[in-house]
Amino acid sequence: MSGRGKGGKGLGKGGAKRHRKILRDNIQGITKPAIRRLARRGGVKRISGLIYEDVRAVLKSFLESVIRDAVTYTEHAKRKTVTSLDVVYALKRQGRTLYGFGG
């Protein structure tokens, strides 16, 4: 594995390393109308203005735990791509079985 850089597989010189932009405060991308639509789907009629930040915080913690478990499944399988089955198994582990995506 000498001289192959970070990837470890393949031949050739290798391309430029990809750098991801560090994303901060993306939770604000969950807009007020998006939260309102989700609440409507759940049968909510009126929504207090103080709810939106709390919903964002709860959603962030929920997604962090699901993504952490899904990435754990991915790393255990020695893959770099998170599949839908990884997410299904992560949700099942947390007691939220999701049907329709295999598994």
UniProtKB/Swiss-Prot annotation:
The record's listing under InterPro entries reads: CENP-T/H4_C, Histone-fold, Histone_H4, Histone_H4_CS
UniProt-annotated stretches for the region Disordered: 1-20
Give start-end positions of Gly residues composition bias.
1-14
One BP term from GO: nucleosome assembly
Q: Which GO terms describe its molecular function?
A: DNA binding; protein heterodimerization activity; structural constituent of chromatin
Residues with PTM N6-acetyl-N6-methyllysine:
K6, K13
Q: Which SMART domains match?
A: H4
**Signal peptide interval:** none
Compartments, as annotated in UniProt: Nucleus; Chromosome
Protein family according to the UniProt entry = Belongs to the histone H4 family.
Q: What is the protein's quaternary organization?
A: The nucleosome is a histone octamer containing two molecules each of H2A, H2B, H3 and H4 assembled in one H3-H4 heterotetramer and two H2A-H2B heterodimers. The octamer wraps approximately 147 bp of DNA.
The family database entries (PANTHER family) matched by this protein are listed as: HISTONE H4 (PTHR10484)
Q: This protein is called what?
A: Histone H4.1
Native organism taxonomy: Eukaryota, Fungi, Dikarya, Ascomycota, Saccharomycotina
